[in-house]
């Protein structure tokens, strides 16, 4: 698909044909700056007869990379336009769901606020509605880590030296507690992290150096007070050990007019990896209820 002269890569698992009984889903990855790879387990939903669309957002993975783009190019609105354009390009904008993970869920919620007529529901997995709230939560978790890990990360942030082996090891300690607790990480997760490292343009510009210091273009993102404006059903999914703290997700749930919430007790930031069977069951059940 082309948008503004730039190409977005996508793949479809399942049949998008008009005869399909179940509405398709578009699956939005996180980051900003990750790739579709680590969300491939969610596309297993296609085995129930529901087409699943995976894509790499512009600047990432198999889509066009723009390392020389002005920082002002990388905005939430850019990716909102891309998501809407993808639904139209595929001819499914009259009837579809969106599943977003982490940043992808933020994008999905922002998309829902535009009230596209064909959107049936949103699943926001491990997604905050407020970046300042998310950063505060991450720092609370960091403060609870071992002193050596905490001090190494804090020192790296102060100095700007976040690529040293010591910093990377400390960050991985945090990630294995609060991002993905499966050991070892599945290949799909490794591929997404390696892709982010190979071209950090989007993550570095929109987020910043780490989860604990967000200084990029999404630093002020906060749609918490607008959540009551969302008219479609929303399922909020997160993990007990998630870097998106459970109390933040609970506060989001309270504001939604048509919201459901499921907490995965044995998961952190990736219940679709950590508790995959239950995740698929919960999500498919929600999607079916939205189509009943």
Residue ranges and their predicted role:
Residues 142-232:
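Alpha/beta-hydrolase
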């Amino acid at each position: 698909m082309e948008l503004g002269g730039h190409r977005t890569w996508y793949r479809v698992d399942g049949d998008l044909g008009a005869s399909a009984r179940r509405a398709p889903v578009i699956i939005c990855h996180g980051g900003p700056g990750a790739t579709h790879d680590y969300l491939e387990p969610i596309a297993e939903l296609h085995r129930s007869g529901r087409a699943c669309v995976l894509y790499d957002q512009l600047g990432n993975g198999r889509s066009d990379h723009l390392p020389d783009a002005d920082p002002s190019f990388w905005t939430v609105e850019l990716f909102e336009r891309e998501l809407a354009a993808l639904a139209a390009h595929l001819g499914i904008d009259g009837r579809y769901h969106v599943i977003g993970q982490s940043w992808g869920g933020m994008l999905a919620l922002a998309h829902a606020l535009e009230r596209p007529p064909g959107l049936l529901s949103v699943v926001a997995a491990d997604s905050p509605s407020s970046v300042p709230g998310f950063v505060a939560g991450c720092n609370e978790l960091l403060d609870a880590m071992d002193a050596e890990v905490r001090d190494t990360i804090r020192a790296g942030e102060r100095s700007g030296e976040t690529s040293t082996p010591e910093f990377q090891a400390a960050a991985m300690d945090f990630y294995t507690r609060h991002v993905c607790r499966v050991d070892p990480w599945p290949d799909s997760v490794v591929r997404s992290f390696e892709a982010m490292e190979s071209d950090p343009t989007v993550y570095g510009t929109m987020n910043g150096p780490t989860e604990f210091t967000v200084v990029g273009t999404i630093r002020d993102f906060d749609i918490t007070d607008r959540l009551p404006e969302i008219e479609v059903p929303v399922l909020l999914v997160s993990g007990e050990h998630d870097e998106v703290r459970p109390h933040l997700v609970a506060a989001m749930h309270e504001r939604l007019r048509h919201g459901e919430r499921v907490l995965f007790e044995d998961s952190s930031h990736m219940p679709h990896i950590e508790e995959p069977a239950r995740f698929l069951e919960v999500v498919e059940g929600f999607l079916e209820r939205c189509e009943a």
